[in-house]
């Protein structure tokens, strides 16, 4: 039985130091509407999201469309890069991708964040077998999850994601069978 997980990278957000409560920007809100229109054609059964406001806001339109609440799953929250703000984000993110077990003080390594994401994926695939599930999440974690199944989903792939972006991962039981990008600007 096939289970489809639609990973939705959140749309553009307005920067605030409040990582959890950072909202979508005006552009992000418009792009979220586009992503929701795309998902309306996918026979979605459930919506699950990271607890971060920008991820929830990106998928709440499809939840409204199907008449379901957005369920929160902490396993899909963004990876913690560092406890304190980093001085050079590009340097910091490059380092964790070059050395998967490396972490900045108070942060998660790629290995740790990936394990957290995969645990959440396995839970959903086991609980919602044969269903179509939207997952509102974050680019870095989404690519780490995809990388677990196929190494071609790497740092360069992450750098080229759109915001938002949508990837449909099709599972047969716990085996990933297919990955398709379904995001497109309308």
Question: Language-model segments: which ranges?
Answer:
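Glycine-rich phosphate-binding loop signature in dinucleotide/nucleotide-binding domains
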Residues: 41-43, 124-131
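Acidic, low-complexity terminal tails and accessory targeting/binding regions
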Residues: 2, 38, 68-72, 78-90, ...
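Short beta-strand scaffold positions
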Residues: 49-50, 115, 136-137
């Amino acid at each position: 039985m096939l289970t489809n997980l639609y990973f939705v990278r959140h749309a553009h957000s307005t920067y605030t130091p409040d990582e959890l409560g950072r909202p979508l920007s005006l552009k992000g809100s418009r792009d979220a509407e586009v992503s929701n229109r795309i998902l309306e054609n996918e026979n979605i059964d459930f919506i699950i999201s990271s607890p971060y406001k920008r991820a929830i806001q990106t998928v709440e339109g499809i939840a409204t469309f199907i008449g379901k609440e957005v369920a929160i799953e902490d396993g899909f929250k963004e990876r913690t890069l560092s406890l304190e703000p980093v001085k050079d984000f590009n340097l910091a993110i490059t380092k964790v991708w070059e050395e998967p077990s490396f972490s900045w003080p108070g942060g998660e390594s790629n290995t740790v964040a990936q394990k957290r994401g995969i645990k959440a994926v396995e839970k959903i695939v086991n609980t919602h077998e044969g269903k179509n599930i939207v997952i509102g999440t974050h680019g870095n974690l989404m690519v780490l999850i995809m990388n677990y199944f196929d190494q071609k989903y790497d740092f360069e792939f992450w750098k080229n994601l759109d915001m938002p972006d949508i990837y449909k991962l099709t599972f047969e039981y716990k085996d990933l069978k297919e990955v398709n990008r379904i995001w497109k600007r309308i």
